Amino acid sequence: MHRRIRTHRSLGAIGAGLMIFLAACGTQGSSPEASPSASSGTGEPVEIEWYVGLGTGTNPEQIPIEEEQVEAFNTDHPNIHLTLTIVDSEEAEGNLARRMPTNPPDIIGPIGIRGLQGFGDTLLDLTESIESAGVDRSTIEDALWDVYQLDGKQIGIPMAVYPAFIYYNKALFDEADLPYPPDEVGEQYEGADWTWETVRELALQLTVDSSGNDANSPDFDPASIDVWGLDAQFTNNDPRAWSTIFGGSGSIVGDDGSTAQWPDNWRDGLQFFYDGMWTDHIIPTKAELDAIEPDGNSFNTGRIAMDVVHQWYTCCLAGVSDWDVAVLPTGPDGTITSKLHADTVGILDTTENPEAAFEVLNWIRQNPTLLQAWGALPAVVDQRDAFFAALDEQFTPLEVAWSVSTLMLGYPDVPSHEASMPNFVEANAANGEFGSRLWTTPGLDLQAEVDAHVERIQGIFDEPG
């Protein structure tokens, strides 16, 4: 099902009535005709449709907030009539694909980097709109602007950012009588540099079987693990994500834009992940995870000591009562890499009203109420203190080291692990299949598997677009 919210007003009316109705996917009527400017010659407001469902924004607690904000926008902007269409996330991509040829919306989002790249050829270049609207680029870090550059087009404005860092279960550290991991870049752990090898050694001490033996013990039973020292959850089986977390920035696409590759640091990172599951047993396999949490939310079980996940994960850890966050370690390339998720909204180039659509986009990206509802760290720097203050109130009495989040923003993966690829949809699916194989199959020659995957990806890249 999808949900469309329209705010109806009569001409000259100050108030607005809200009507919500449900309709089956694919049965929407045509969008109302709109004039090519933000104020029609007839005095009628320009119609703009905002399509939500390709990322966050569909949770039950988020929808009323989005509805209220759209109603407020329409009250404050008599020249634009904004319609909010909310589609279940499981159906949104297919629903939009069916609409694109004849009845596309104007604005899509929130949508992540991976999703936005899939629409790259159909997105409006925002460069001129950004300049004409006087958007202050200095309020957002340069590295975040670069994320939304595609083939010379600025396809989005940084809106919501979600750096990755380590969430850790303080109770499990206390049980093991181990110090907590560092919350400052450059800080050592027990006299050792904070590297992935240090994390591995720590995770071995935190991984415990049902008899209480840690993974360093000769009596450790990997068939009956009770607590795992490490995880990197919610990656959509994407081996590019695992390679980036443990290996650093890289790209599956060569500099020529058409050659498939797997950089050496990515190979090292993926080997770390694979060995962590099948050799060291410090990371849960797919079968082990399914046994404790079929939905994949491993940290929330209380049985994961350290978990690499993003800022948005504050949505989903009610099951752990005492936790904090730590900085990521340096990788095999000698640098820290915080795998970045980022949401924005984009304008489809089929819009008949680009000026009005950009006015809406600019309102969405700066709306603190929406950003808080989405659990989104604002890309605009001066909005962040209020965001973290709200989180402190939410998680009282915990005193979370939120400075970690802003520190990790300084180490994004550039290029993004979710960046554009030739034949994006097919290549993305192949990556997921490869990731699933690694997650479920022991005893593989990983480097040979990577070679075979690169060969497969090259074949996909070479297919006519």
Region spans (language model):
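Extracytoplasmic/periplasmic substrate-recognition and gating elements
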Residues: 81, 279-280, 318-381
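Short helix-initiation/N-cap motifs at beta->coil->alpha
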Residues: 86-95, 191-198, 285-300
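Short, solvent-exposed loop/beta-turn-alpha elements that line the ligand-binding surface or hinge
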Residues: 127-140, 182-191, 220-223, 228, ...
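Glycine-centered hinge/linker elements that transmit conformational signals in sensory
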Residues: 200-203, 240-244, 254-288, 319, ...
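Long, aromatic- and glycine/proline-rich binding clefts that accommodate carbohydrate-like moieties
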Residues: 326, 375-433, 437, 464
